[in-house]
């Protein structure tokens, strides 16, 4: 199963650019092609909700490379969510992130 995260924001157009750029950088760091997919948004009450899916190959590299060493959380899925959230935040993104499926 591929990790799936739900991202939410009030500034979808701006955040989409930041998230894509950050994930492309992470993809390059992992030396993986097609490591993520951003799904179409759903708009509700001024918020945009969109899913971010990681490939199993990218997940494997993140897990085995030690990138998540300082990620806090109870269990692997929460640590991965926190790692991705902090990575996006470090690149200027202000999206909210939650586990949708893992």
Which sequence ranges carry the predicted segments?
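Short, intrinsically disordered low-complexity segments
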Residues: 32-75
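Extended Gly/Ser/Thr-rich low-complexity repeat segments
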Residues: 17-25, 60-83
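Amphipathic alpha-helical binding modules
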Residues: 75-102
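Short, extreme N-terminal segment that most often corresponds to the first beta-strand
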Residues: 1-25
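Ser/Thr- (and often Asn-) enriched beta-sheet segments in non-cytosolic proteins
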Residues: 2-8, 51-53, 94-96
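Short, flexible N-terminal segments of the mature chain
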Residues: 17-40
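Surface-exposed polar/charged interaction patches
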Residues: 29-33, 65-68, 86, 90, ...
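Generic structural motif
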Residues: 10-12, 55-59, 100
């Amino acid at each position: 199963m591929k990790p799936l995260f739900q991202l939410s924001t009030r500034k979808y157009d701006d955040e989409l650019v930041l998230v894509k750029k950050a994930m492309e950088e992470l993809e390059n760091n992992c030396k993986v092609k097609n490591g993520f997919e951003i799904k179409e948004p759903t708009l509700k009450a001024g918020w945009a909700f969109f899913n971010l899916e990681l490939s199993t190959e990218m997940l494997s590299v993140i897990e085995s490379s030690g990138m998540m060493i300082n990620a806090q959380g109870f269990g692997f899925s929460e640590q991965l969510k926190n790692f991705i959230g902090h990575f996006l935040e470090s690149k200027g993104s202000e999206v909210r992130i939650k586990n949708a499926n893992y």
